[in-house]
């Protein structure tokens, strides 16, 4: 089997570390690994498959010559600055930031939904969608295969880790401070997250939606090549890891609960967990660190014959970031399009 030379850019971050775990867990075929980071991260040593690798500082040079694929999770500014440095020698850049997602000449890919889009990448860049979008479209694809989805209303319940490792630490610290009767530290979120939910993820735009909510609208339409209408409300909740979403869809024809269950059960990347009578439904507590999108609480909309409601939970650092990117590379390798 063809083995690749792989780079990870931003390896010291939460997603960068997840790249290492996912590549190992999936036995990704590679014979060389190069790690890149900022000047602060340069010199750090990480172990992968029993070998130690030292982080190199990301610079404008020829370090990417000979590298087949680069998994990049270093922020949009870094991605934009180093795009040509990474791709100029033919490296496929799979980027986890929002920098290129809506660029017409950059494919936005979820392998369970639109893998072929990854083959058309004139700039050598493939964008990883936002974590909330990935989770939703994997589930939507199963319903879209039954009947065209006209519109979606979705509310998200997003874990603290979606804002980074320091956000998780702040949530833990807040609980500790409050239990001691101390004033909680509030730096990473607009308000105290402990014992609270915050209907505010990313910054607000002129139309009243946040950037996170608009990502779900714009990205879903691009990925699904659809005129689908999406209205999202994104909420931060005091959960450590794994996002949840309550999703309502309106389809062109009525879809029964039985049809939907069968479609989800057979869908790629989905696990059906829908036995409410036995208190069996997806929850972040049990989904964290798992690969699939879990779907449950499937029910007909009692006010709209063409409406269907369901609940999804997925690990946003895995499927919502690192795993999706690695699956893109696996697809390119499978069809012989990576080298």
Predicted regions located by residue number:
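N-terminal Rossmann-like NAD(P) cofactor-binding subdomain of oxidoreductases
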Residues: 1-193, 229, 293-294, 298-303, ...
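Charged docking surfaces used in two-component/phosphorelay signaling
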Residues: 70, 160-339
């Amino acid at each position: 089997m063809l083995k690749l030379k792989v780079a990870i850019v931003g390896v010291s971050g939460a997603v960068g570390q997840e790249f290492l775990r996912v590549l190992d867990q999936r036995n990704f075929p590679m014979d060389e690994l190069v790690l890149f980071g900022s000047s602060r991260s340069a010199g750090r040593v990480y172990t992968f498959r029993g070998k130690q690798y030292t982080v190199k500082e990301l610079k404008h040079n020829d370090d990417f010559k000979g590298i087949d694929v680069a998994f990049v999770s270093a922020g949009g500014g870094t991605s934009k600055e180093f795009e040509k440095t990474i791709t100029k020698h033919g490296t496929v850049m799979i980027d986890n930031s929002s920098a290129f997602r809506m660029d017409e000449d950059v494919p936005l890919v979820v392998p369970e939904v639109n893998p072929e889009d990854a083959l058309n990448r004139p700039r050598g860049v493939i964008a990883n969608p936002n974590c909330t979008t990935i989770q939703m479209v994997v589930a939507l694809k199963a319903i879209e295969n039954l009947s065209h989805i006209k519109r979606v209303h979705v509310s998200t319940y997003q874990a603290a880790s979606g804002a980074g490792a320091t956000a998780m630490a702040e949530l833990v610290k807040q609980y500790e401070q409050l239990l001691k009767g101390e004033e909680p530290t509030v730096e990473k979120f607009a308000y105290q997250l402990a014992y609270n939910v915050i209907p505010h993820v990313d910054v607000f735009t002129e139309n009243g939606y946040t950037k996170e909510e608009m990502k779900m609208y714009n990205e879903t339409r691009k990925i699904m090549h659809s005129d689908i209408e999406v209205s999202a409300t994104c909420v931060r909740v005091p959960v450590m890891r794994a996002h949840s979403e309550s999703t309502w869809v309106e389809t062109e024809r009525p879809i029964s609960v039985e049809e939907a269950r069968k479609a989800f059960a057979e869908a790629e990347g989905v696990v059906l967990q829908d036995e409410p009578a036995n208190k069996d439904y997806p929850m972040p507590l049990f989904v964290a660190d798992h690969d699939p999108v879990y779907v449950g609480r499937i029910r007909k909309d009692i006010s709209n014959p063409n409406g269907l409601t369901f609940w999804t939970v997925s690990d946003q650092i895995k499927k919502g970031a690192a795993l999706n990117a690695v699956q893109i590379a696996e697809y390119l390798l499978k069809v012989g399009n990576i080298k």
